[in-house]
C-alpha cells in the first residue's frame, strides 16, 4: 500500500466529504483521542461533510452522534442512522429519541415489522454461536443493538482465528451477512452494509447520489469490514494498524498512514486540508 504522502499533490476533484470507521480508526484503546476529535472539527470547519459508519450499535453511538462534530453516525453496518433532530418524522424513517437533551433523530433502512422479525431470528443464531463456538460471547454492547448481533473477539476477550471463522460460518449458514471488525464479529439479515449505508445517508441528508460523486469522498478504515469501502472509494485510506488485517483483505486501501488509530485519522485530515 502506498503511503499517504504519495496521495498529496495528485490532481482530483474538490472533495466534499469524509466517511470514517470508528473503532481503531477514530478511537485508540476504546476512546476518541483529542487529535482525532480536533481533526473532525477541522474538517467540518473547512466545509466538508463528515459521517462515521460503524458496526457499533445505535445505542452505543447516540452520545457520540450528539457530541462529535459529525453530520451523522450510521450504525450497525449501514442499518440505522443518527443525526441531530430533523424537522419531519415518518413511520419507517425518523423517530425522535426520548432523551431530548441529545436532540437526535434515528432513521432505519428496514420497516418495523421486518426489524422485529429479524431480531427474533438473530437471537437464535446468537444463542447457537455461544453454545457451539468455544469461548464465544456476545459483545458487551449487545443491549444497544437493534438490527444486528455481535460476538466479541478482541475487545474484552480474545478468540482465535478458527473460532472467529466458525462464528462467521454459522452466521452465513443461517442466511446472515457477516463481517469481522477489529473487535467484533457482526451478523445481520438484509441487503445493507457500510457502502449501502453511505449511499443511503447521502440521499437522506443531501438528496444526492453518492455514486455520481464517489471521487469527491474519502473513506478511512482499519479492518476487514472496511474492505467494501476500500474497494469502491478511489480515495480510501487505511490507518497503519490495518496491517494486522492485510492477509485477510481481498481489497486493500489505496493509501496507508504512518500513524495508527486516531493519530492516523488526524494525519488523513491534515493531508486533506493541506490540499484544499
Where are these regions (language model features)?
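Mg2+-dependent phosphoryl-transfer enzymes with acidic/Ser/Thr/Gly-rich catalytic loops
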Residues: 8, 13, 33, 195-276
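Active-site T/S-Asp motif of two-component receiver
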Residues: 20
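Active-site phosphate-binding/coordination module
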Residues: 31-143
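Short, hinge-like loop/turn segments at secondary-structure boundaries
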Residues: 68-71, 91-93, 156-157, 197, ...
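Short, structured coil segments at secondary-structure junctions
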Residues: 68-69, 77, 174, 232-233, ...
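Conserved acidic, metal-coordinating active-site core of Asp-based
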Residues: 124-232
Amino acid at each position: 500500500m502506498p503511503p499517504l504522502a504519495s496521495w498529496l499533490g495528485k490532481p482530483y476533484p474538490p472533495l466534499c466529504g469524509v466517511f470514517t470507521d470508528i473503532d481503531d480508526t477514530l478511537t485508540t484503546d476504546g476512546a476518541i483521542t483529542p487529535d482525532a476529535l480536533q481533526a473532525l472539527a477541522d474538517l467540518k470547519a473547512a466545509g466538508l461533510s463528515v459521517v462515521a459508519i460503524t458496526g457499533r450499535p445505535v445505542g452505543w453511538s447516540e452520545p457520540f452522534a450528539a457530541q462529535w462534530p459529525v453530520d451523522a453516525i450510521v450504525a450497525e453496518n449501514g442499518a440505522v442512522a443518527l443525526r441531530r433532530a430533523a424537522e419531519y418524522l415518518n413511520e419507517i424513517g425518523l423517530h425522535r429519541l426520548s432523551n431530548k437533551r441529545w436532540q437526535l433523530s434515528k432513521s432505519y433502512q428496514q420497516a418495523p415489522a421486518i426489524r422485529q422479525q429479524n431480531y427474533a431470528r438473530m437471537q437464535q443464531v446468537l444463542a447457537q454461536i455461544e453454545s457451539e463456538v468455544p469461548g464465544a460471547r456476545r459483545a458487551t454492547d449487545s443491549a444497544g443493538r437493534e438490527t444486528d448481533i455481535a460476538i466479541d473477539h478482541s475487545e474484552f476477550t480474545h478468540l482465535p482465528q478458527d473460532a472467529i471463522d466458525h462464528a462467521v460460518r454459522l452466521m452465513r449458514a443461517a442466511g446472515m451477512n457477516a463481517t469481522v471488525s477489529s473487535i467484533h464479529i457482526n451478523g445481520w439479515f438484509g441487503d445493507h452494509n457500510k457502502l449501502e449505508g453511505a449511499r443511503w445517508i447521502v440521499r437522506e441528508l443531501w438528496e444526492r447520489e453518492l455514486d455520481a460523486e464517489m471521487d469527491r469522498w474519502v473513506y478511512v478504515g482499519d479492518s476487514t469490514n472496511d474492505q467494501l469501502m476500500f474497494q469502491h472509494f478511489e480515495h480510501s485510506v487505511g490507518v497503519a494498524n490495518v496491517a494486522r488485517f492485510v492477509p485477510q483483505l481481498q481489497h486493500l486501501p489505496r493509501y496507508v498512514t504512518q500513524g495508527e488509530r486516531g493519530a492516523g485519522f488526524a494525519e488523513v485530515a491534515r493531508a486533506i486540508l493541506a490540499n484544499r
